[in-house]
Amino acid sequence: MNISIISIGKLKEKYLKQGIAEYLKRLSSYAKVEVIELPDEKAPENLSAAEMLIVKEKEGIRILDKISDDTHVIALAIEGKQKSSEEFAVSIDRLATYGKSKITFVIGGSLGLSSEVMKRSNESLSFSKMTLPHQLMRLVLLEQVYRAFRINRGEPYHK
């Protein structure tokens, strides 16, 4: 399986980089995983609603440019469907069973994802009703993908 994670914003925190590197290493025996980091749109602090929309649209264009036509796209969004780790594992397994060998997860910037990215997405996933830093979501997502592979193979880890 080929998994891409497209994320807006440069990761600066060393501890997050280390955690991400660890899970990429662990995942290497299950799937080919690629993390694509795209620059965020520079914007002043107090944006109007129209300015926020423009920022999301510009970031959305960058994201859509990196998504291939043959991939199953899962957008990470606070309004997405919440799943348990086991339900998420079943979703990953079903995609593989039905011939979806490419999955792309999309993590937006601090303002979220554009409507065009949401339209392109096959599904929307939420890890919490709480707002989480988009940089932290990379690590959380990789851990859950790793956990899903372990669950699907009946390997210990997820308890």
Curated annotation (Swiss-Prot):
GO molecular function: rRNA (pseudouridine-N3-)-methyltransferase activity
Residue sites binding S-adenosyl-L-methionine per the record: 76, 108, 127-132
Source organism (scientific name): Bacillus mycoides (strain KBAB4)
InterPro entries xref list: Alpha/beta_knot_MTases, RlmH-like, tRNA_m1G_MTases_N
Entry keywords, A to Z: Cytoplasm, Methyltransferase, rRNA processing, S-adenosyl-L-methionine, Transferase
Pfam families the UniProt entry points to: SPOUT_MTase
Taxonomic lineage: Bacteria, Bacillati, Bacillota, Bacilli, Bacillales
A GO cellular component annotation in the UniProt record: cytoplasm
EC number: 2.1.1.177
Signal peptide annotation: none
Similarity field: Belongs to the RNA methyltransferase RlmH family.
Domain of life: Bacteria
Name of the molecule in the record: Ribosomal RNA large subunit methyltransferase H
Role according to the record: Specifically methylates the pseudouridine at position 1915 (m3Psi1915) in 23S rRNA.
Gene3D superfamilies on file: 3.40.1280.10
Subcellular location as annotated: Cytoplasm
Catalytic reactions of this protein: pseudouridine(1915) in 23S rRNA + S-adenosyl-L-methionine = N(3)-methylpseudouridine(1915) in 23S rRNA + S-adenosyl-L-homocysteine + H(+)
Subunit structure: Homodimer.
PANTHER family to which the protein is assigned, alphabetical: METHYLTRANSFERASE, RIBOSOMAL RNA LARGE SUBUNIT METHYLTRANSFERASE H
Keyword Protease attributed: no
